[in-house]
Every structure is written in structure tokens, then in C-alpha cells.
Amino acid sequence: MRTTFNRLRAVKDSLPHGSMDAIAAELGISGEEVRAFFNGEGTADYHLEPGFDGGIVDLTNTRILEVALRRAWEEQNAL
């Protein structure tokens, strides 16, 4: 999947407080790994190329992003 770095930052900014650790717990990974994902600190599944809107990000594993998008949607649509 390809997206932009600024789009990833927008997803991060839309998450409620404490989401990094909640995402990590759900996926069975460390909170630091989730933070690194959104801060552009390279992981094996994350490749950043120079380009518009902060650069082009090529994700080979989208599970962190998928959980983050779901949590952001749930927060936005909470009653």
C-alpha cells in the first residue's frame, strides 16, 4: 500500500489519547513500535521515499494502520 507521510501523521493526530499503547496491545507488539511507525522511524514494513506531502510511504504490512484507522473511525463516530 502506498500513502503519504502527512496522511499517516493525520491518522495519528486523529487518534484519542492512549491509542498507541492500545494498538500495541491489540497487535501484540510494543508501544514503541507503533510510535516509530507513525514517526517515520524505519521498520522492515515501512519504506519512505522523497516526494510530495512529506514523502511517499510504501507499506508492506498495513496492520498498524488498519487498527489505527478503525480506532479513529470509532472515536469520530462515538455517541
What are these regions (language model features)?
Residues 31-52:
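Recognition helix of helix-turn-helix/homeodomain-like DNA-binding domains
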Residues 1-17:
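Short, amphipathic alpha-helical "recognition" segments used to contact nucleic acids or chromatin
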